[in-house]
Amino acid sequence: MGDDRAVIKFSSEDCGICHKMSFYDQKVTEELGLRFIDVKMQDTATYRKYRQVLLTQYPDKSAMGWPTYLVCEAPEGEFQILGEVKGGHPKGEFRSRLQAILELATIEPSS
């Protein structure tokens, strides 16, 4: 598969749930064959690189969760958002939510 699919985690240094999720979010993401991109809002260079992806989903950032995981294709190029996982979840549920997004993306080619 030539797909460049990634999970972009938007989080904040002072977010306790974000920190807790970091014990397994990257591992689960990579086990599912996706790249993991960690974007902390305080890291302006990295945030600037992926800001457009976040603003496409949340134009004013008000409804985003902490953390917000956006599953997307070609995150550095003509990206397409496939789905999202918002907030903190136990490891098993986080995996299930990512798998559900991937299954939908495989079944329904987006228009």
Which residue stretches match the model-derived regions?
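Chalcogenol-based redox active-site neighborhoods
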Residues: 16-26, 44-45, 49, 53-64
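Local sequence-structure signature of Cys/Sec-based thiol-disulfide redox active-site neighborhoods
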Residues: 1-35
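Thiol-based oxidoreductase modules, predominantly thioredoxin-like and allied folds used
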Residues: 10-11, 32-52
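Catalytic cores of transferase enzymes with a strong primary signal for eukaryotic protein kinases
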Residues: 36-40, 61, 70
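Non-catalytic, surface beta->alpha helical segment in thiol-disulfide oxidoreductase systems
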Residues: 64-110
